[in-house]
Amino acid sequence: MRPAELPPPDPDALVTSRRLLERIGAELAASGNWISFARYMELVLHEPGLGYYAAGSRKLGSSGDFVTAPELSPLFARTLARQVKEILEPGEAVLEFGAGSGALADVFLQEISVPYFVLETSPELKQRQEQRLGARVRWLDRLPQKFRGVMIANEALDAMPVHAVAWTCAGIVERGVCVDENQLAWSDRGAAGDVLLNAQKIPVEVPPSGRYESELALLARLWMRSLARILERGALLVVDYGFPEREYFHAQRSMGTLACHYRHHVHADPFYLPGLQDVTAHVDFSALARAAAEGGLDLLGYATQAQFLVNCGITEVLGKENPGDPARYLPAAAAAQKLLSPAEMGELFKVLAVGRGVTTSLCGFSNGDRRSAL
């Protein structure tokens, strides 16, 4: 879909977007009219009071821009809780990154009585979580120094800033952002530093067009290493859309994975209404697994969301709904279809588990474990 075909913003939202544009323009003016796309993504998503996750617009649900698995139905949280129960030892806790509306924690805590922590960067979402969850949850401003238990990152990594890179016949360039004719635009520079070093390690074949574009999630790798430092015992479960490296940098994916979400429409222009749309990139699960290994964590499993949920017993969870109550059963069955269908979330979404000191095999990966693909 082209931006011209998208629904118009309301006047107040447009004012916020224009203020953010001024903020971006000021940074560009102070930086020689070029910033990395990772920095641009940080600004449009997280700039205090103005960024997508830092301002007050509604993100989730029918009136927002996208719907996550916990929003669809309690099925996801109830099924995930089965895996978490298997990992947890007495006295341990759960830590969720980016808890959205609080739907996952709400249902999860009906299944398991456990200390539950949330690390949330969005003030608006934190307020919604507080209203929904109350005293059942504790909110953190930063990572704890040590942690024992299970950490959950459900659709948290896709919104972490990424560096945009292009492999060309002339070499590797970093795609940044500039102002051109009073409009935000892409601008190439020769890649350098960590961006160049990491891009050189990827066996990209430059197509006949002479250009292959993609993303490097360097921040996600740092995030993984930081979790490895604090995890004394337990596991991290990452649920997100993405691919192993071989598929991520496939020859047919020469335009990368960047996508923008605005009022349930997906398009490809990251410069449209800055601050009013979500800007995302798919997760490179191979890079994430390597970062975990570098931090001393064990790779516990990797599977499609559909396989993981089936292994954890989603059909049994659905079976607890009464088919004689269509008002409850039919929405639950429809949600299960969306969570499991290869045409919906079942195949594109993956589950990665890494950890330390977990000696039991995890039920979520008992069949269809794709660790060898990483």
Residue ranges and their predicted role:
Residues 1-147, 165, 255, 307, ...:
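Rossmann-like AdoMet
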Residues 44, 151, 288:
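A residue-level signal for conserved active-site and pocket-lining positions in enzyme catalytic cores
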Residues 200-374:
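Long, Lys/Arg- and hydrophobic-enriched amphipathic alpha-helices
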Residues 145-169, 214-218, 222, 230-237:
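A short SAM/SAH-binding and catalytic strip from SAM-dependent methyltransferases
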Residues 125, 159-160, 245:
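Catalytic P-loop NTPase motifs of RecA-like helicase/translocase cores
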